[in-house]
Amino acid sequence: MNRTAYCFDLDGTLTTVEILPCIAAELGISEEIATLTRITMEGLLTFEESLRLRVAILGQVPLQTVHGIINDIQVDPRLSAFIQSRPDQCFVVTGNLDIWVNQLIERIGCGGHTSLATAKNGVISLRHILDKGEAVKSIRNRGFDRVIAIGDGSNDVPMFRAADTAIAFGGTHSPMPAAIAESNFVVHDGDALCKLLNTL
């Protein structure tokens, strides 16, 4: 039997909003972080450079506050239902920090691959920035014959290249040109995405 793994980007793919601008609103700089997020998704700034900068800025927000903000973030109900119907085959693959998003991934109800960080005395230190391509290889090595990747930004390109099938998803906003260029399918609606996933 063919075993398929489904790898989902988190921000703006599974969630109905981008997470980091929501955290930035606590500091009154949501527009600035949204701009930084956008130029990163467009590939104008490397994900590593952008993440280090965003962590340095947003690390000022207490973890408890971050968890409260993320707890209020909605997940696309159609994608959530798809994942919950096959949790052992689904994975969140996000460059976001484990200490910020682990509770959200638990709520989604599947495995997750994240960037790693520690928090000590109110200071966040990055330990490891996730390589999405390596995450897909790691997931494949768990005994999956096929990997389908779903994302929306240029930072999803390594995941798309390592997968067998790549889907650029525009659920929250249009997928970036780099993601579209590496994709096999482009979908703009959660219902359409679930139908496609069920037929692949």
Question: Predicted segments — roles?
Answer:
Residues P77-L200:
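C-terminal cap/substrate-recognition subdomain and adjoining C-terminal extension
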Residues N2-K120:
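Alpha-helical substrate-recognition element adjacent to the catalytic core
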